[in-house]
UniProtKB/Swiss-Prot annotation:
This is Leu/Ile/Val/Thr-binding protein. Its main location: periplasm. Residues 1-21 form the signal peptide. Keywords: Amino-acid transport, Disulfide bond, Periplasm, Signal, Transport. It is found in: Periplasm.
Length: 365
């Protein structure tokens, strides 16, 4: 291998300081900044560990994988700029993006430019419903997660008066509507369905409305910054309402915001892959670097790299890799993964968990 090239820039930062001519560059795109940067931390932790492990075992036919980090801040406009930067940098493989609202516009560019994208986090069904050939994911869909939440609400919680809140974004509103649809199919109507503004911090009006309407259950579609504030302010006002949210709220930063008010929150998310015995060596390696292995996107990202590895061992052509994966079963840290023709995982299941004030989650009963 020859021709050392230093990878640097305001947007792109290499996880490895040097790349060589025979190295295989992989764009790892997520939020390094902005209100949900914690999810980017999970993604980059998983990517770094997966690439280290793949390279330690010989890489791709002797060539090393080199990750190049890009920050889209989970912002659609910045995601488009990043996607164009990836194109200009000549990278053919993308792990990312994270948020559905930024993943979808970026995927338009990747598809047009012949770049393979495997997202470890974007759950919007629309992403893979457009006939694209180069888009896959290693997570489930809102159309899976919403019914899982609705089923638990109907069968386990059985509340009397339900409100559904969302952050007016593709991910949050899509999930909220999926939950609402699931409840309606179960014969239950919600008292109100409404949106808040992402970034908002004062929820006194919402809390007053919940109290006035005697709401005993709230489903929130969105991310942890707003969920944390809603929990904290609701408990401060004396509300005993049960709250529930998706994997977008299941972040230790939620507990930092809500404190003890986070205890007992219900969340739907992928299983706790850090608790799988076979994954212990990976958990130990991540902990040795003073990083947190518990985040869901650590593992969906690791699995995305394993999937890319399987594809690259077959071909270096993005279209051929996508075609290969849609007919293959890949052994990963999440278990065996296989995809349908749209690029969605077959048989992916979300679980329901109790969230605790210390930032951990246990299986809900």
């Amino acid at each position: 291998m020859k021709g050392k090239t230093l990878l640097a820039g305001c947007i792109a930062l290499s996880l490895s300081h040097m790349a060589f001519a025979d190295d295989i560059k992989v764009a790892v795109v997520g939020a390094m900044s902005g209100p949900v940067a914690q999810y980017g931390d999970q993604e980059f932790t998983g990517a770094e560990q997966a690439i280290a492990d793949i390279n330690a075992k010989g890489g791709i036919k002797g060539d090393k994988l080199v990750a190049v980090k890009y920050d889209d801040a989970c912002d659609p406009k910045q995601a488009v700029a990043v996607a164009n930067k990836v194109v200009n940098d000549g990278i053919k493989y993308v792990i990312g993006h994270l948020c559905s609202s930024s993943t979808q516009p970026a995927s338009d560019i990747y598809e047009d430019e012949g770049i393979l994208m495997i997202t470890p986090a974007a759950t919007a069904p629309e992403l893979t419903a457009r006939g694209y050939k180069l888009v896959l994911r290693t997570t489930g869909l809102d159309s899976d997660q919403g019914p899982t939440a609705a089923k638990y609400i109907l069968e386990k919680v059985k509340p009397q008066r339900i409100a559904i809140i969302h952050d007016k974004q593709q991910y949050g509103e899509g999930l909220a509507r999926a939950v609402q649809d699931g409840l309606k199919k179960g014969g239950v109507n919600v008292v109100f369905f409404d949106g808040i503004t992402a970034g908002e911090k004062d929820f006194s009006t919402l809390v007053a409305r919940l109290k006035k309407e005697n709401i005993d259950f709230v489903y929130y579609g969105g991310y942890h910054p707003e969920m944390g504030q809603i929990l904290r302010q609701s408990r401060a006002a004396g509300l005993k309402t049960q709250f529930m949210g998706p994997e977008g709220v299941a972040n230790v930063s939620l507990s930092n915001i809500a404190g003890e008010s986070a205890e007992g929150l219900l969340v739907t998310k992928p299983k706790n892959y850090d608790q799988v015995p076979a994954n212990k060596p990976i958990v130990d390696a991540i902990k040795a670097k003073k990083q947190d292995p518990s985040g869901a996107f650590v593992w969906t990202t690791y699995a995305a790299l394993q999937s890319l590895q399987a594809g690259l061992n077959h071909s270096d052509d993005p279209a051929e890799i996508a075609k290969y994966l849609k007919g293959a079963t890949v052994d990963t840290v999440m278990g065996p993964l296989s995809w349908d023709e749209k690029g969605d995982l077959k048989g992916f299941e979300f679980g329901v968990f109790d969230w605790h004030a210390n930032g951990t989650a246990t299986d809900a009963k």
